């Protein structure tokens, strides 16, 4: 396998608060990377930085043949990025599909319309072609019978599966998941994780921010434990989750696994 995603010395601050201090890691094509850590540790900011939804202060992100050195991304006098930089960020975003914590579906569009929005509007794909593929993707996530329903007519788990289909519609190199089950009722979590497990089995490259330790143990090729904007510990789940070496990782997992 070859390295598909490379992150080098990523840093990001919001005012005086440094969320990411110095993050570096790599992910090989066809593998699943799970990111765990306490609230406020920088997990979501890291994920959003990979497709430039957040612009890091410095650091380099490479996905496939697209590399962005964020130290060179500098707004012009009116706060607008130069055209070449906007195009570079757009090229990076095109390499990934994002599945959000709270679905982020367009409420006035059907499930199918949500799925084909990106390919048609952003990528210029013909509506007929995008529709055929959109229906295939909804079938892929078990929602072929719900293509014409609006988000308010779907359960939270169904909405999240529409979100997964939408992320896949752009044919991304890597799929980014930001706590995809944290907003769901417990009985709906299994359906979403089932889709994610099948995607992993099919060889999709996935980077997943999650608190689902069992999923990480079963599916992840590597786990990153992040705290204080740093990668404190990384490795296969058999090491990081089952046999953590760093005291911060041990303390976090102990709290997470404590009986209620």
Description of each model-found segment:
Residues 228, 238-260:
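C-terminal boundary and immediately downstream tail of ABC-type ATPase nucleotide-binding domains
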Residues 3-237:
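ABC family nucleotide-binding domain
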